[in-house]
Amino acid sequence: MPPATQAVIKPANPGATPPTADLVALKGRQQASWSSGDYAVVGTTLQIVGEELCEALDLRAGQKVLDVAAGNGNVTLAAARRWCEVTSTDYVPSLLEGGRARASAEGLKIAFKEADAEALPFDDGAFDAVVSTFGVMFTPNQERAAFELLRVCKPGGQIGLANWTPDGFIGQLFKILGKYLPPPAGVKSPALWGTRARLDEIFRPGASSIRAEPRHFNFRYRSPEHFVEVFKTYYGPMLKAFAALDATGQNGLRHDLIALIASLNKASDGTMVVPSEYLEIVITK
């Protein structure tokens, strides 16, 4: 779709109003959730998304790149492999340690810093590019997070995002989890970051252009049951969901997840190949 332009560059600061107690509490629960399990087992399978996002941004050697809600560092490593000066941030220390170990194994020089996506500890316009793959979309205060991404990006710089869409496989998985463990009232779905309308709402005041292209990532597992077992063991949000339910609830959740996979599975040999739509987004400030 053709990009649109906007004359206004400086957005209003949504952080002028302190976050509500509910959002603060939710962030604490999210942090505990992402700290549980071992996200790297799942996260590293998504590496190709980080590589493709770096190509979409056309990153150049020497550019200063900030990865926000970096997890175990997929796009962090992808940018560093292109000789960028990368700073990798997350509010979960164990995830940063995973990224640091991966960088060390490849001999990549990367700065790692614990940071909240809604209150980034960097100066205005400090980075040529700001990136996040399936990370910043989970922030409770979406407006504040978008403001922070724009704030630390230099004028004319780029923000690159990969966000799951509401109707894709992971977006539908979110809806199933929400049926069993409803989010607090008023909390917006992270999958809204995968819609053009929401991107326009939270980024347009400070962006000169927004380009969003649908892409697909294929989840490949030994079987639908294998996917559920891996995610309930290593993916914090699903691990916490199963742990919070009684046996009846766990069986219902497992049944609904298997049914969702069956409805989308491209494999006919007992394995699982399920494409999940996401938006690859390039925002120019």
Listing of model-derived features with the role each one plays in the protein:
Residues 143-144, 150, 154-223, 238, ...:
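Conserved catalytic/acceptor-binding region of the Class I
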